[in-house]
């Protein structure tokens, strides 16, 4: 399967089912009471991190995901079934961004972790809900609310315990193959590795293991998008321990400076990670030159381990050093997960706009109209769109309890003025407050 670590998708949660407007019917009962049931909740869209998946490629064929709607309520107080939640399985290390706001909406760093990224709509209430001592046969019910829709960008940042970073042809793939059971493409030319490759490294006694990633070779300017650029730097941010793989036959100290410059430019916190230096291809130089290079690298304050991926020299020591230095996985995950930004549920503030409409007949006074926006009133009107006339009394009492009439009075509304909320119009009476 091809490797893909960025994917744009669209998700839509299910709509809530409408409540039922129904009355009980029986053979010997001419006028039964209201018995409309509630609509079901719409299904939500949920991201779920699973094992055994290392790429977003499996989602490429389906870019749009829609959860089922809730079922309508029915008579005899039967509630509509909830829509099933839709799960999108992704690799551990997947981050989801809202493409419109750019905010982080999910960051899945553990197997089994879930996050709702589009919430299903609420089911509407049936007419049985609206019975009162003075309203014993309500001929209206509530509509379900729409499910959330979102444009989402998925970015995979592989969660490997150890990341091998270095310039092209430094021997990272050979080192990964020598230490683990991975089988990367290996050749003596740059950019053999074009996507991250994971391997599993076991301790000498086979009791412990960790994952190691061969990250594609860095070039100067990678943090600005040159070469493979951000396509691989993203994955380095997830590793608990960095191994700088340097070719002893080149200029290791200068290459390490450039590597750290690129990492610092992309994300300064990367240089705070636990790290060591694997001085590779040690079989190609004599002992004196190797010792001199080690002395030059001492200024960086990192452990230096001379190794040869080709002959196996120094590999047992490198393996043990990695096990000794690895930070605790759970503690690291808790402190390095991206912070999900809380959902903002902000209700638009109430605003009243006054206008005068031209009279229908010459000589008549213009119609005084108050437009109502915000305060949640428009959303409530929409939920009774099919039965606005029958629900007028209920809505009028609801708006009174929620302070609309007091707000109109303070704004200067007069007896008989028209109040307009979307398509719903009614007359204002001073005694309503």
Swiss-Prot record:
An essential GTPase which binds GTP, GDP and possibly (p)ppGpp with moderate affinity, with high nucleotide exchange rates and a fairly low GTP hydrolysis rate. Plays a role in control of the cell cycle, stress response, ribosome biogenesis and in those bacteria that undergo differentiation, in morphogenesis control. GO terms for molecular function: ATP binding; GTP binding; GTPase activity; magnesium ion binding. This is GTPase Obg. GO terms for cellular component: cytoplasm. It is an enzyme of class 3 (hydrolase). Residues 1-159 form the Obg domain. Keywords: ATP-binding, Cytoplasm, GTP-binding, Hydrolase, Magnesium, Metal-binding, Nucleotide-binding. Belongs to the TRAFAC class OBG-HflX-like GTPase superfamily. OBG GTPase family. CDD domains: Obg (cd01898). Residues 160-327 form the OBG-type G domain. Residues 342-430 form the OCT domain. Its main location: cytoplasm. ATP binds at residues 166-173, 191-195, 214-217, 280-283, 308-310. It is found in: Cytoplasm. Its cofactor is Mg(2+). It comes from the Bacteria. InterPro entries: G_OBG (IPR031167), GTP-bd (IPR006073), GTP-bd_Obg/CgtA (IPR014100), GTP-bd_prot_GTP1/OBG_C_sf (IPR036346), GTP1-OBG_CS (IPR006074), GTP1_OBG_dom (IPR006169), GTP1_OBG_dom_sf (IPR036726), OBG_GTPase (IPR045086). Its EC number is 3.6.5.-.
